[in-house]
Amino acid sequence: ARARAQEAAVHGEVPVGCVIVRNGEIVGRGRNQREEKQAAVSHAEMEAIAQANAALGSWRLDECDLYVTLEPCCHFGKQPPCVNAILEAGISRVVVGSADPNPLVSGKGIAALRVQGVAVTEGVLREECDALNRIFFHFITTKRPFVSMKYAMTMDGKIATVTGASKWITREAARADVQQQRHRFSGIMVGVGTILADDPLLTCHMENGKNPVRIVCDTQLRTPLQAQVVATAKQIPTILATCCADPTRQAIYRQAGCRVICLDKRNGHIDLVQLMEKLGQEQIDSILLEGGGTLNWAALESGVVQQVQAYIAPKLFGGQEAKTPVEGAGVPVPSAAFRLKNSRLTHLGEDILIESEVEYPCSLEL
């Protein structure tokens, strides 16, 4: 079930997986496929039940056990609840990994099964299942996007040479993995400095990839009208987040196809907490932050980053003035450092990827 959930995540779905077992043999497998199939009923449980029905030649699954990574839904939304399908199929035992924090579910799915006599075992591999759903859990509980700060750097901590050149730090395998991340995340965010320096398109380059919503933090609306993100704004959703209240200036970008969100200023920058609230209201549940050192520091200082993804190449750039991933004012003493936890290391050819969760002091937690 976890493997199916991971497969769902790769395809940009909410990572839920399900298997149905009869007499020790898997007879049905399913994962969330709503986006892929554009079908409201394509929840993991529904897919697994349909496959088991076909395999056994029966709509009744009385002698079967169902294993699912996330508590089955019990509310009517765009489809009937998965709990209803489980009961209708006559499944006698359900094993659940994670409880669903969604207030519409939150234990109600498990309770509904038990009331009807289904044996339910909770919390099996809970930590592993929770990790699969970090983005979903964060968004459903905070109403703000899950933000992953991603950068590529050399082993001496440089994201560019002293001349500002950065193509390419990592090799093909690492860059291909970045495209997978762009496919999975709802939004991608950079600062205007990145636009001015690199003029990136900020799209997903993989075949059949899904382009994230592009978000540019531009305090004074300095993004050139000929920049690629503006030139393609009518084809790919693009948001300019700014503190510039000039209606004439805003209208120029809107006419080009951009959405302009005017925000307050905080510590000399766009109020990123306010921006996250606005983006959450638009159902943007996750953001890949590909900013430079200034924006990355502002995001950490604001407490909006949940994860760091560092792609590290076995190279040394040197250079006192060469850019680093996190700049800004910095912390005064080592004890004030932003701490990272639950780190995971992945080899990508000669490069490595380190993914860590950010641990904030209580005063910074959103």
Regions from the language model: what does each represent?
Residues 101-104, 127-128, 196, 222-224, ...:
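Short gly/pro/ser/thr-enriched loop/turn and capping motifs at secondary-structure boundaries
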Residues 16-24, 151-152, 354:
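Short beta-strand scaffold segments in enzyme catalytic cores
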Residues 28-128, 213, 239, 244, ...:
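Zn2+-dependent cytidine deaminase-like catalytic core
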Residues 245, 327-366:
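Conserved histidine-centered catalytic loops in small-molecule metabolism enzymes
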Residues 1-11, 139:
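Short, basic/aromatic recognition patches
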Residues 138-144, 148-155, 159-285, 294-297, ...:
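Active-site ligand-binding patch in enzyme domains
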Residues 301-340:
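Flexible, gly/pro- and Lys/Arg-enriched active-site loops
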Residues 1, 17, 48, 73, ...:
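Residue-level signal for inorganic ion chemistry
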